[in-house]
Every structure is written in structure tokens, then in C-alpha cells.
Amino acid sequence: MKRISFLTGIFFVLGLVACQQPSPPTSQINDSNTPLHLLAPDYNFSYKEWSIAEIKQTIDPILGYLDKVTPIRVIDRESGKEITDYTKINQHSQLEQGDFRLASYEWGVTYSGMLEVARATNDPKYQEYVTKRFRFLSEMVPYFSQQAKEYNVVDGQMRQIIQPRALDDAGAVCTGMIKLNRIFPDMDFSNMINTYMDFIENKEHRLSDGTFARMRPQANTLWLD
């Protein structure tokens, strides 16, 4: 019995010693032993060259959403009814408001992006999105210009086109129109492009050396980019 107890004690001590032995060091992967470009990223988004089909699975639903929330209709502000006879546009008429403004700086960038997507994917839907809206805006210019002259009021979205007051009103949207016009020279957006270019060249605030600047939020504020 004593021998059994003795052996049990020895095995217990050996077990404790074994537990205290350091485990073999694990190799830490870093840039010193594995080039960064070979490391697997920690995020779940696949870091790879995506196919057009895979990209379109994501962006096609976005196009569908944007098409719905940026309508191209004129409504009566008081009744909310759509105006289809544009000769009846008056002081109560406005472009239907969606989630995004059709002539904003951000949407000018979006238009250019849509044209690039159409070129890269060979999908005409993206180009059609831009074409429909530019044609609509071009058609609206004479009616809302008359609105401004006759009633001294103008729809906010159309004001950015017919009475631009800042580079943000003009630059990005004008760029999108010029890009589309180069694809389709027969599309005439000169009634908008000329107004934009006149503002950019002759009316936008500049420093004495010609650098574009603006008077907000402080005098002679410059864009960092």
C-alpha cells in the first residue's frame, strides 16, 4: 500500500512538472516573415479582383433604388398633382422632390459615375438613367426660366441650373453633361452647359491669382483637394 502511495505521489509531481514546461512557441505571422500582400485580411469582405457579374449583383439594386427615388416629374405644389402639360407651369409648379436633388453637386458626381459604370459593364441601364434626367432637365429650362421672369420665383432644383450661385451648383453637373454629350454629340444640352460655363468662367469668386475660392464658411475659403 505504501509503495502504491509512493508511486502515485511521484506521478503527481511529474504531472505538475510537465504542466509547467513551456509549450513550443507559435510562429506569429507579420510583415517580417510574411509579405503584407500575402496576408489574409481580418475583415469579411473578399479582397480579390471582382468579376463584372459579381459587382453588378451589388450595384444593380442600387440603380433600381436610385431610379425610383429621383423622379422626373413636375407637380403642383398646392395640389400635389402631376403636371404633364408644361405650358401650364406657374408659380406653384416644382420638380417632384425625391430622396436626392437632380442638379446637386453630389448628383453631378453620381451622373459621371453612372456613365463610367455603363462603359465598364456594357450595361446601357446606367447610361439611360443619366440620359433621361439630363433630357428632362433640359426640357424644363425654358419653362422654369419663364417662371422666374414672370413670377420672380423658381423651383429650388431648377434654380441651381438656371441661376447657379456657387461652383457646387455648376461644376459637377456640367461635367456630367459634357461627358454624355461626347458620347452622343447629337444631344444638345447647351442651354444648361452654357449657363454653367458662364458662371464658372465669369462669376464664381476667385482669388487675385485666379484660384477658385468661396466666401463661406469664411472669406476666401479654398478646397483642400
Q: Where is each model-derived feature located?
A:
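Bacterial N-terminal signal peptides that target proteins for export
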Residues: M1-L7
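N-terminal leader/targeting segments
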Residues: T8-I10, F144-S145
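C-terminal motif of bacterial Sec signal peptides marking the signal peptidase cleavage site
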Residues: L16-A18
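Low-complexity, Ser/Thr/Pro/Gly-enriched N-terminal "stalk/linker" regions
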Residues: S23-N152, M187-S190, N194-T195, K203, ...
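Well-ordered alpha-helical segments within folded domains of soluble proteins
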Residues: P35-Y43, L102-R119, G156-M158, Q163-R182, ...
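Short linear capping/connector segments at secondary-structure termini
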Residues: K149-R159, F212-Q218
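The feature captures the catalytic groove of carbohydrate-active enzymes
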Residues: I200-D225
